[in-house]
Curated annotation (Swiss-Prot):
Alphabetical list of Gene3D superfamilies matching this protein: Umud Fragment, subunit A (2.10.109.10), Winged helix-like DNA-binding domain superfamily/Winged helix DNA-binding domain (1.10.10.10)
Function: Represses a number of genes involved in the response to DNA damage (SOS response), including recA and lexA. In the presence of single-stranded DNA, RecA interacts with LexA causing an autocatalytic cleavage which disrupts the DNA-binding part of LexA, leading to derepression of the SOS regulon and eventually DNA repair.
Record bears the keyword DNA repair: yes
Name of this chain's protein: LexA repressor
Source lineage: Bacteria, Pseudomonadati, Acidobacteriota, Terriglobia, Terriglobales
Binding region for DNA: 28-48
Domain of life, source organism: Bacteria
Length: 210
């Protein structure tokens, strides 16, 4: 890696950690808060230095557009963790009946998350709130998200709304607008201009801890 000052290294590590854990890049305000900086100008300065050294790339026309460029051979922590989970097998002991009992399997197989995710780039997010409860996705659940930047109408996606936070909703395109539809009769859909929404991924599975 190119030579960095201590502060540049700290900011680069923060950006890597934030992006790995959230699945999207931080805003300048979040960087300032996370780094304990009182001035956004200082954030801009360090981001500019990291960009000039080839460690970041930005799209100046989009919010949260910082892309961390990693040295060859350096795997994202989230991807490394996902790979470890995907190869960790769990014993599959057979089916369980909700009606009459069924025969147990004497020679259990092994199932890994890789059987479900395949070669996709997948990350995990924990759900906060009840907006998707009618899809049986509730507060505290974990969703498996395939990292993509486009999705078909009706798919459950992780969407980043400009000047706002990420949200988990079904996506529908309606002309020049996008409708982010909750699955909760008590909540209203979010309608925003199409250009202000970025798809971060689509949900491919749900995990629940009892």
């Amino acid at each position: 890696m190119v030579a960095l000052t201590r502060r540049q290294r700290e900011m680069y590590d923060f950006l890597c950690s934030f992006t790995d854990s959230h699945g999207y890049s931080p805003s300048f305000e979040e960087i300032a808060e996370g780094m304990g900086l009182s001035s956004l100008a200082t954030v801009h300065k360090h981001i500019g230095n990291l960009e000039s050294k080839g460690l970041l790339k930005r799209d100046y026309n989009r919010a949260r557009s910082i892309e961390v460029l990693r040295p060859k051979g350096q795997l994202k922590k989230s991807m490394a963790a996902a790979a470890a989970v995907a190869t960790a097998g769990l014993p599959f002991l057979g089916r369980i009946a909700a009606g009459q009992p069924i025969e147990a399997i004497e020679n259990p197989e092994t199932i890994s998350l890789g059987d479900f995710t395949g070669s996709k780039e997948v990350f995990v997010l924990q759900v906060s709130g009840e907006s998707m409860q009618d899809e049986h996705i509730v507060d505290g659940d974990y969703v498996l998200v395939e990292r993509i930047n486009t999705a078909r109408d009706g798919e459950i996606v992780v969407a980043l709304v400009e000047n706002s936070d990420t949200t988990l909703k079904r996506i529908y395109r309606e002309g020049e607008t996008v409708r982010l539809q909750p699955s909760n009769a008590k909540m209203q859909p979010i309608r925003v201009p199409a250009g202000s929404v970025q798809v971060q991924g689509r949900v491919i599975g749900v995990l629940r801890k009892y």
